[in-house]
């Protein structure tokens, strides 16, 4: 005996139950991300599709570099998190899934969420086009309002999001450099899982206080004086003085010897930067499709992004920095902390 045409089959009911359980489970864990299954049309057309839904807020966040040096940044924040970050939360999605991003603007200027995806509806553009066409005008989010942006990624790799507003007498560039940017990692469903790390290179925003503010930053951090400042800290207080700067002014990424990482590097700034890490081959999975960058140096024009496959073969702290050396001297430095594979690596304080 068949089912009436208007009655879902047991299989479709099970799919809905599974989707409900997944939503309930993820919602209990995090208000930031929900993953669920969207039914097909039931008529043999569209198939069921996984939806990855993120919830973000745009908020003010003070980034304290110590010694009275503070950046009053604008940031994207995970709903439920204590404060925002620069860069904003990294969003992950797999080719074939739908990405939904719900954004609430909690600042006193209009802001938006613009990506470099393709093949999306104009209502998800998050630019001035939404205002002048009045199609999805709310995508340029007024203070206190929210908007949902939807995308369907077609190929894997690194993309990013940023504010596209020029509200409040500030330029689009100023909105971005004030901290409103973040990464989107699009995964290949046919590839095995791999560790992802995202590094943004940029100039710092305009709203700062203190006389030791880094002009150039990586992942929101910078140490004026660069590597020489690390030498001076060691001379003054030993390694503890150096370690006190870890993930405060100097970004540190800990990994194991032999561990493969995909390091996604983005130049979100208006200047030419370059990226170099010590003692590792810079295999380009994006721009060069698997070839190694000559000189193990990734050149980066403004807006450029690439994915580097890194596998360190020797333990130790290994520097990474902008190889426009004046930028490194001004603070654009970081460390890969590579440890022997004797247990789980932990991030330094």
Predicted regions and their residues:
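Short proline/glycine-enriched turn/loop motifs at strand-loop junctions of beta-rich domains
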Residues: 106-108, 268-271
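Hydrophobic beta-strand segments within beta-rich accessory/binding domains
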Residues: 101-103, 163, 263-265, 275, ...
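Intrinsic, low-complexity N-terminal interaction/targeting segments
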Residues: 170-171, 274-276, 282-298
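N-terminal, post-signal-peptide metal-ligating segments of extracellular/periplasmic oxidoreductases
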Residues: 36-123, 127-128, 133-146, 179, ...
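A short beta-turn/strand-edge loop motif at beta-sheet boundaries
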Residues: 112, 273-274
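Extracellular/periplasmic metallocenter environments
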Residues: 107-111, 118-121, 129-192, 298-349
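Extracytoplasmic low-complexity repetitive segments enriched in small/polar residues
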Residues: 87-89, 97, 196, 200-205, ...
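Secretory targeting signatures
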Residues: 1-48
């Amino acid at each position: 005996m068949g089912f009436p045409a208007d009655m879902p089959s047991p299989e479709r009911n099970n799919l809905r139950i599974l989707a409900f359980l997944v939503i309930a489970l993820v919602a209990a864990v995090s208000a930031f991300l929900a993953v669920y299954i969207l039914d097909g049309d039931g008529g043999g057309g569209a198939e069921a599709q996984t939806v990855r839904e993120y919830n973000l807020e745009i908020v003010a966040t003070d980034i304290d570099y110590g010694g009275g040096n503070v950046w009053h940044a604008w940031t994207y924040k995970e709903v439920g998190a204590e404060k925002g970050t620069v860069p904003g939360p990294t969003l992950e999605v797999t080719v074939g899934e739908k990405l939904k991003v719900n954004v609430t603007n909690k600042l006193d200027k209009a802001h938006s969420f613009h990506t470099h995806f393709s093949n999306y509806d104009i209502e998800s553009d998050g630019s001035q086009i939404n205002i002048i066409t009045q199609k999805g005008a709310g995508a340029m989010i007024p203070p206190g309002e929210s908007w949902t942006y939807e995308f369907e990624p077609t190929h894997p790799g690194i993309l990013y999001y940023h504010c596209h507003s020029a509200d409040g007498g500030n330029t689009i560039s100023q909105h971005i450099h004030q901290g409103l940017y973040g990464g989107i990692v699009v995964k290949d469903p046919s590839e095995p899982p791999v560790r992802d790390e995202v590094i943004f290179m940029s100039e710092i925003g305009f709203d700062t206080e203190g006389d030791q503010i880094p002009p150039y930053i990586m992942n929101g951090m910078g140490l004026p004086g660069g590597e020489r400042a690390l030498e001076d800290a060691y001379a003054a207080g030993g390694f503890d003085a150096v370690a006190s700067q870890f993930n405060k002014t100097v970004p540190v990424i800990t990994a194991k010897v032999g561990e493969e990482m995909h390091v996604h590097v983005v130049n979100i700034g208006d200047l030419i930067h370059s990226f170099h890490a010590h003692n590792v081959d810079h295999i380009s999975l994006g721009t060069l499709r698997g070839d190694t960058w000559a000189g193990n140096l990734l050149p980066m024009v403004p807006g450029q992004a690439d994915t580097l496959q890194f596998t360190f073969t020797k333990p130790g702290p290994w520097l990474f920095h902008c190889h426009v050396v004046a930028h490194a001297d001004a603070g654009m430095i970081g460390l890969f902390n590579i440890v022997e594979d004797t247990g789980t690596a932990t991030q330094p304080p």
